[in-house]
Amino acid sequence: KDGKKLIREISELSPVPVFFRAHSLLVTGDGEAALKWGSTNAYTEDENGNPIYDWTIIDTIFDTYIDLGMKPLAQIGFMPEALSTHPEPYRHHWKPGAKYEDIYTGWAYPPKDYDKWAELVYQWVKHSVDRYGKEEVESWYWELWNEPNIGYWRGTTEEYIKLYDYTADAVKR
């Protein structure tokens, strides 16, 4: 409630569109926020490894931004548990005073299947265009990952470049 009020006030102060970003938009979980953790459960797989997409939480976030006159800065990340090369442990339980490195768990790793990753990104962009319109979605910024130069990315530089290539192709498809 108060967060929406603050976002609205920020939006109203600016003569140009304000872009707003949420982390962890593709992270697996129950959608409940916790210290240094967020999740949307946008991607899971059935028992046969087939993708299941659920945009409910992301839609709620982006609907809020748009309803308040803002634009999403769509952060493409982090890795869903079903796609992570190192899914266990997945959710961290970091608390102040603990080593910060403990925050980097399964969500920070490359995908085990780059084609499934690209399809996830494509389906998200396609869903966004279907929901908000092409003109609106083309006005957004799309960011891959966040600070891959630190522990937020546990793969190699080459794996990040590969992730970038697959992601950029999927967004533009």
Residue map of PLM features:
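Mature N-terminal, pre-catalytic/accessory segment of carbohydrate-active enzymes
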Residues: 1-18, 23
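Substrate-binding cleft and catalytic face of glycoside hydrolase catalytic domains
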Residues: 15-173
